[in-house]
Swiss-Prot record:
Residues 124-206 form the PDZ domain. The chain crosses the membrane at residues 39-59. It comes from Staphylococcus aureus (strain COL). Residues 18-27 have a biased composition (Polar residues). It is found in: Cell membrane. Pfam families: CtpB_N-like, PDZ_6, Peptidase_S41, PG_binding_1. This is Probable CtpA-like serine protease. The lineage of its organism: Bacteria, Bacillati, Bacillota, Bacilli, Bacillales. It comes from the Bacteria. It is a single-pass membrane protein. Belongs to the peptidase S41A family.
Length: 496
C-alpha cells in the first residue's frame, strides 16, 4: 500500500466537460454559484463541488503506524471470517471484489464524514487528474445546449484546435456512433482515451457535416487566468493543483509588466486542492519564515512556514481577494494567511468554512482511501471550520446567481406550492419578466409570465414550467451571468 498525503479537489472534468444540462449526483446541497465558465458546469450540471484539502509533502509530526491491540485484532479477525464465510458458503456465488468494497464502504460510512471516502481504481484516476490538471483527450471545452453537444472553444494549441475544430461546432457522432440522447459526461468519456490513439468526431458546422480525426494527447488545464480591466489586474484562480503557484507568479509578473498596482485575486467558487500550493502561493506575498497554516492533530501542532523571500514585484501591489461561499479549503488557507498578515483586503461574501485536512492512501490495485486526519488553523490561530472567513467588505451576490437548481424532471403549474417556484420567480425577474412576489405559490400571474417567456423563446405555450422551459430558463440565466459579473464590477469600482 502506497501511503501518501496529497490533495483531493473536485471531480471536475475540466476542459472537455464545461457544461451539462444533465442531473448528476451531488455531495451536499444543490446551491449554485454562477461565475463565468466555472459556474456553467455547476449550474447546468447541478454539480456542486465538495471542497476538500489534503496535504502534499507534509508528513505530520510523530505519525506512526501502531500495532493492533487485542480488541482491534479480534474485530479484524471477525471481518475476515465473515468475508470468507460469505465468499465460500453463501448459497449464491458472490463477487469477492464487491464484498471487499462493501466492507470498506461500510467502515467509511460509519465515520459520518462527508470528506472521507473510498475510491475505486477508475475514480482514483479521475481524482488524480483533478490534482495534476492533466488528462488525455483532445482539449476542447464542450457544453450541452438545446440537447446538442457543442464545442465552446478548443484550447489554444490543443489537438482539437490543430484539427480545425471551431467554437459552436456541434458534435453528432463519436467514432461513427450517434451521441443523440447521451449525457455530456458520457460523450466526454467517449472522446477521451489512451494517449496517441485517434478519435473521429462527426461535426456539424452550419449545413455542412464532416468527419474530423484527432489524435489524443496529454492535456494540461491551467488553473490561473489573468486579465487587465482598466487599471486593475484580475487574476482568477480556479483551483489549487500542481504548479498553480507558478502560474500565479507568472500572472503577477504580467500585471507588474503592465504597470498595474491594484490586483484582484478572484477565488470565488474555488474548491481548494493542494495545500503545499497554497503555501507557495502565499509565499509570493508573505516573507520567508512566516507561518502560513497550522496543522493540529490531538495535542500536536505543526506550523507550516514560507521558505523563500516574497516576490519583489508583488511587494508594492495593493492586493484584494474576492471570495464567496464556494471558496473553500486551500482557498481559505491562502485567504486566511494573507488576511492575518494584512497583505490583502478580503471582499465578497463569507467563505465555505472547511478547516479539516484529508490524507490519501493508495493501494496496489489502484484504489484509494481518503480520510480526515487533522484540522488546520490560520496563522493567528483561527479555526474556520463551519464558520468560514468573513470578508472585510461585503459585496452581495445577485440572487439569480445563487439559485438552487430546479429538477427538470418536475413540471410546475397553477395551484402548486413548492420552494422551486420561488426560484422560478427570482430567475424570471432577473430575465426582465414582471414578477410581483417571491412566494412559493404558482399563481395566475406567474402562469402569464411563464407563457410570455415560452412565447419569447419559441417554446410551446402552456403556462406550465416544464422540462423544455426549465432548460431554456437555465441557459439564459447562465448567459446573463456570463455577460455580467456584477460582483467583480462593484469591486473594481470600489478600487478606482
Amino acid at each position: 500500500m502506497d501511503d501518501k498525503q496529497h490533495t483531493s479537489s473536485s471531480d471536475d472534468e475540466r476542459a472537455e466537460i464545461a457544461t451539462s444540462n444533465q442531473d448528476q449526483e451531488t455531495n451536499s446541497s444543490k446551491r449554485v454559484h454562477l461565475k463565468r465558465w466555472q459556474f456553467i458546469s455547476i449550474l447546468i450540471g447541478t454539480i456542486l463541488i465538495t471542497a476538500v484539502i489534503t496535504v502534499v509533502a507534509y508528513i505530520f509530526i510523530n505519525q506512526k503506524i501502531s500495532g493492533l491491540n487485542k480488541t482491534d485484532q479480534s474485530n479484524l479477525n471477525k471481518i475476515e471470517n465473515v468475508y470468507k464465510i460469505l465468499n465460500s458458503d453463501y448459497y449464491k456465488k458472490q463477487d469477492s471484489d464487491k464484498l471487499s468494497k462493501a466492507a470498506i464502504d461500510g467502515m467509511v460510512k460509519e465515520l459520518k464524514d462527508p470528506y472521507s471516502e473510498y475510491l475505486t481504481k477508475e475514480q482514483t484516476k479521475s481524482f488524480n487528474e483533478g490534482v495534476s490538471g492533466d488528462f488525455v483527450g483532445i482539449g476542447a471545452e464542450m457544453q450541452k445546449k438545446n440537447d446538442q453537444i457543442m464545442v465552446t472553444s478548443p484550447m489554444k494549441g490543443s489537438p482539437a484546435e490543430r484539427a480545425g475544430i471551431r467554437p459552436k461546432d456541434v458534435i453528432t457522432k463519436v467514432n461513427g456512433k450517434s451521441i443523440k440522447g447521451k449525457a455530456l459526461d458520457e460523450v466526454v468519456k467517449d472522446v477521451r482515451g489512451k494517449e496517441n490513439t485517434e478519435v473521429t468526431l462527426t461535426v456539424q458546422r452550419g449545413s455542412e457535416e464532416k468527419d474530423v480525426k484527432i489524435k489524443r494527447e496529454k492535456i494540461h488545464v491551467k488553473s490561473v487566468e489573468y486579465k487587465k480591466k482598466g487599471k486593475v489586474g484580475v487574476i482568477t484562480i480556479n483551483k489549487f493543483q500542481n504548479d498553480t503557484s507558478g502560474e500565479l507568479k507568472d500572472a503577477v509578473l504580467k500585471a507588474h509588466k503592465d504597470g498595474l498596482k491594484k490586483i484582484v485575486l478572484d477565488l470565488r467558487n474555488n474548491p481548494g486542492g493542494l495545500l503545499d500550493e497554497a503555501v507557495k502561493m502565499a509565499n509570493i506575498f508573505i516573507d520567508k519564515g512566516k507561518t502560513v497554516v497550522k496543522l493540529e492533530k490531538g495535542k500536536d501542532t505543526e506550523a507550516i512556514q514560507t521558505s523563500n523571500d516574497a516576490l519583489k514585484e508583488a511587494k508594492d501591489m495593493d492586493i484584494s481577494i474576492l471570495v464567496n461561499e464556494g471558496s473553500a479549503s486551500a482557498s481559505e488557507v491562502f485567504t486566511g494567511a494573507l488576511k492575518d498578515y494584512n497583505k490583502a483586503k478580503v471582499y465578497g461574501s463569507k467563505t465555505f468554512g472547511k478547516g479539516v485536512v484529508q490524507t490519501t492512501r493508495e493501494f496496489k490495485d489502484g484504489s484509494l482511501l481518503k480520510y480526515t486526519e487533522m484540522k488546520w488553523l490560520t496563522p493567528d490561530g483561527h479555526y474556520i471550520h463551519g464558520k468560514g472567513i468573513k470578508p472585510d467588505v461585503t459585496i452581495d451576490t445577485p440572487k439569480y446567481q445563487s439559485l438552487n437548481v430546479i429538477p427538470n424532471t418536475k413540471t410546475f403549474k397553477v395551484g402548486d406550492d413548492d420552494k422551486n417556484i420561488k426560484t422560478i420567480k427570482i430567475g424570471l425577474s432577473a430575465l426582465g419578466y414582471k414578477v410581483d412576489n417571491e412566494s412559493t405559490q404558482f399563481d395566475k400571474a406567474l402562469e402569464n409570465q411563464v407563457k410570455a417567456f415560452q412565447q419569447a423563446n419559441k417554446l410551446e405555450v402552456t403556462g406550465e414550467f416544464n422540462k423544455e422551459t426549465n432548460n431554456k430558463f437555465t441557459e439564459l440565466l447562465v448567459e446573463k451571468a456570463n455577460k455580467h459579473d456584477d460582483v467583480l464590477d462593484k469591486l473594481i469600482n470600489i478600487l478606482k
